[in-house]
């Protein structure tokens, strides 16, 4: 007996290795087809300001974009935003911006808003936003420089300049939330939806 009952693999509208690893480890077969969208432009035009709302919109837009090119397929979109108080962070453009973000986050608590949306034929079948709370320890400029030297260009791949599944874990005093939520794809609500659709045997 197999775990997955779908007629075709799930389509993941993301090139994130962390999200792909989460699905692989959960035994969910998938095909990764990234959505080519101007995420910042979509968020700006939307007029939304709440981090969770922006993440939800972008997850839905990614899934809908890929769904339009792959009719009949079940498409999963995901997005994550970082909020420090009322301020939302974007992925740093370069090392200097990553260092600036880390200096702002150091010694403070921020939130990660992770959203997923499941779409078929342009229709959203399921959507969820889950929050994780992260407490970064105080960091000196020297520690930030050492960290950025170690991680290299990957600092620009994630909002906040860190990847907690790697060396980024050294930056934290406290982490409150589901591991998959922190990595940008809340698995538990996704698995619950897939079970409700009779797509899983477990």
Curated annotation (Swiss-Prot):
UniProt-annotated location(s): Cytoplasm
Biological process terms in GO annotation: nucleotide metabolic process
GO molecular-function terms, A-Z: nucleoside triphosphate diphosphatase activity
Active-site residues from the entry: 79 (proton acceptor)
Coiled-coil region list: none
Record flagged with keyword Nucleotide-binding: no
Required cofactor names: a divalent metal cation
InterPro entries hit by this protein: ITPase-like_fam, Maf-like
E.C. numbers: 3.6.1.9
SUPFAM superfamilies listed in its UniProt record: ITPase-like
UniProt key word Cytoplasm: yes
Root EC class: hydrolase
GO cellular component terms, semicolon-separated: cytoplasm
Catalytic activity: a ribonucleoside 5'-triphosphate + H2O = a ribonucleoside 5'-phosphate + diphosphate + H(+); a 2'-deoxyribonucleoside 5'-triphosphate + H2O = a 2'-deoxyribonucleoside 5'-phosphate + diphosphate + H(+)
Keywords associated with the record: Cytoplasm, Hydrolase, Nucleotide metabolism
Family: Belongs to the Maf family.
Protein purpose: Nucleoside triphosphate pyrophosphatase. May have a dual role in cell division arrest and in preventing the incorporation of modified nucleotides into cellular nucleic acids.
Name assigned to this protein: Nucleoside triphosphate pyrophosphatase
Protein source organism: Rhodopseudomonas palustris (strain BisB5)
């Amino acid at each position: 007996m197999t775990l997955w009952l779908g007629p075709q693999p799930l389509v993941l509208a993301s090139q994130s290795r962390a999200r792909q690893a989460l699905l692989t480890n959960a035994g969910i077969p998938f095909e990764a087809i990234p959505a080519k969208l101007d995420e910042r432009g979509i968020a700006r035009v939307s007029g939304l300001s709440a981090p969770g709302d922006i993440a939800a919109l972008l997850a839905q837009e990614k899934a809908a974009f890929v769904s339009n090119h792959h009719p009949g397929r079940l498409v999963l979109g995901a997005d994550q935003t970082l909020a420090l108080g009322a301020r939302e962070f974007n992925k740093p453009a370069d090392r200097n911006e990553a260092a600036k973000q880390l200096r702002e986050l150091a010694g403070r608590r921020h939130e990660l808003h992770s959203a997923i949306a499941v779409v078929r034929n342009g229709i959203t079948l399921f959507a969820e936003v889950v929050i994780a709370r992260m407490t970064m320890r105080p960091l000196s400029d020297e520690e930030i420089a050492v960290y950025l030297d170690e991680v290299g260009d990957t600092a620009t791949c994630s909002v906040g300049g860190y990847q907690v599944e790697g060396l980024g874990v050294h930056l934290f005093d406290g982490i409150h939330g589901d591991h998959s939520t922190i990595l940008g794809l809340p698995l538990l609500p996704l698995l619950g939806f897939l079970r409700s659709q009779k797509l899983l045997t477990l």
